[in-house]
Amino acid sequence: MQTVLDGKSLITAAMLAGTLPRGKLEHHGEAFETARAELALILHATQQQIEQDKTPAEIVGRLLSFLNGLHSKVHPDVWHALIPVAQNHPILKYFLEDPLTHWSFTKPRGYSGDAQLLDYIYCDPHVAESVANASEIGKALYSHTQNVPSCVAARERRDLLTRYVDEIAVKNGPQTEILAIAAGHLREANRSVALTEGRLKRWVALDQDPQSVGLIARDFQGTAVEAIDGSVRTVLTRGHKLGKFDFIYASGLYDYLAHNVAVKLTKTCLQMLKPNGTFLFANYAEGTPDAGYRETFMDWVLLLRSEVDMWNIVNASVDRNTVEARVFFGENRNVLYAVIEKRG
């Protein structure tokens, strides 16, 4: 089933690239040639390591480190031009043996960062068979890639969402209503005590991928979870009469949204909160050390943000006199969170 994209929700790297400011590469001619030469050396050295049968962990660990070094020092326009150079190198085939890298690069659902990719990152039982069927090299690579800092941060993010839901349910009682936007497979619900004990009125899971919506409906049948097919546009246009909520969150979505769309979505979500309700959004942070590998060999480009960027979204969306707001890093500083609590 081909997923229909609306340009405002989960999107492909090419679509995301259209939202990013890009200069002309000719302005960086010499810098590009220097960077391309450095990348060629990195790729050649990696190929030699593969031919010498070095361990997959050593090979991918070294590549991650060198790509991060290059990514962090070149201009974004130069880096963007280097991505296809890396992707067209013969060593790509080796790294595609890793089920996580393979799923991300080939995009079976037609877009980046889909829910099954997150299942690989979560080491979820739903992908255990796929991992078991990988080659020995693939399994060894996966043992490393699943534990890069951004993946560790994604698992922490999942567990943080569960804690927020359970704490808000304790505070508000059995009438608690939750909304997850771009819910994916809603894995954070698997460990929710409030859901298991029937202490939620409803947990609405909105996603634009029909496969994800179907899986949620199947896995959480008979619970307070309601799976709904819808996108950012659905929320912005109030396409569904969703009602009001105690807690709304968008944990893996803002990484794909330009500032103006992020502000519109934040404003809309705040209008959908009950008095004293809470809105949370998360975003991968600038400086994530695996961005170089992710953007090349995983073909997964994210809009990384700083603390200032997060505050800019918050401040453009609210009257700070009417809310309590905070921005904070996760434990390994790879993910940023913004939490806005509505006063009264």
Task: Describe each region flagged by the PLM.
Residues 2-77, 85-89, 144-168, 172-176, ...:
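Class I (Rossmann-like) S-adenosyl-L-methionine-dependent methyltransferase catalytic domain
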Residues 84-173:
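Class I SAM-dependent methyltransferase Rossmann-like catalytic core
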Residues 181:
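Conserved beta-strand/loop positions that form the S-adenosyl-L-methionine
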Residues 237-248:
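A short acidic, Gly/Pro-enriched loop at the edge of an enzyme's catalytic core
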Residues 250-253:
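A short beta-strand submotif of the Rossmann-like class I SAM-dependent methyltransferase core
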Residues 257-258, 273-275:
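Helix-to-beta-strand junctions that scaffold the AdoMet/dcAdoMet cofactor pocket
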